[in-house]
Amino acid sequence: MLSAIAKPLRLGHAARQMTHQSSDSKSERLSPYQQAIRRFDAENARDPSTELADGVAQPRELLYAQRLTEWMLKLCPDASEELRLAARSQHLCRWMIPRSSYAMTRAGYLRWRTDLKTFHSQKAGEILREIGYPAAIITRVQELILKKTFPDDPESRLLEDALCLVFLQHQFADLAARTAEEKLIGIVQKTWRKMTPAARQAALGLPFAEREKRLLERALAQEQ
C-alpha cells in the first residue's frame, strides 16, 4: 500500500526534474541579445516606482526602456544590435541614484545627469560581459549610452530622437502640469533642436491635448 502511494510521488519528482532541465535548456538556446534584453528587463523590473500604462501599474524604468525600444524601432526597424542594446539599457537601474542625493541646484542637476550616464554604461557593460559579448560591442553600447559621439554619429542621433519622442509622448503632459509656461517652452525648444527632421515629423503627429499642443506651437513659433 505504501509503495503504491510512494510511486506516484517518485514520478512527480522526476517530472519536476524534467521541467527544470527543460527550462535550463530553453535558457541555453537564447541568443546573447535575447539574454541581454532579459537581464536588462529583470533589473528594471526591480524599480519600486510604478507608472500606469493601459490601466496597469508597471515598474517605471521597465516601461521607459520598452517605450524607448519601441520608438527606436519605429524610426529604424533595422537598427543595429548595439543600438538596440543601448536603447534597452539607457536608464538601467536609474532609481538607484535619486536626484535627491545631489544638491538641488543647476550644478547638482548636471552632476547627477553625468553620474547617471556613467552608472548606466557601467551596469550595462557588466551584464554584457557576463553574457559573453565581445569587447568591441560592449564599448560601442557604452559609447552610445554616454552620448560620446552625439550629434555627429547617426546612431547616436537616432537614439536621441527616440529619447525625445518618449519625452514628448509620455512625459510632456505631466511636466507641463507642474512647470511654469516660459520655462517649459524653453525645455521644448531645447528638445526640438536635438531632433532630426524625421523625428520632428513624428512628434507633430502625436495626439497632444489642447494645452500641450498650444505650448508646443508657441515654442516652435519662437524658434522660427
Please describe what each predicted stretch is.
Residues 81-100, 120, 124, 143-149, ...:
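His-Asp-centered metal-binding catalytic motifs of divalent-metal-dependent phosphohydrolases/nucleases
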Residues 100-142:
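Helix-adjacent hinge/juxtasegments
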Residues 3, 22-25:
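Serine residues within intrinsically disordered or low-complexity segments
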Residues 76-85, 132-144:
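Acidic/histidine metal-binding catalytic segments
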Residues 52-56, 107-113, 153:
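A ubiquitous short alpha-helical element
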Residues 24, 28-38, 42, 55-62, ...:
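Divalent metal-dependent phosphate-bond-processing catalytic cores, especially two-metal-ion Mg2+/Mn2+ enzymes
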Residues 10-13, 17:
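Short, positively charged and aromatic/hydrophobic N-terminal segments
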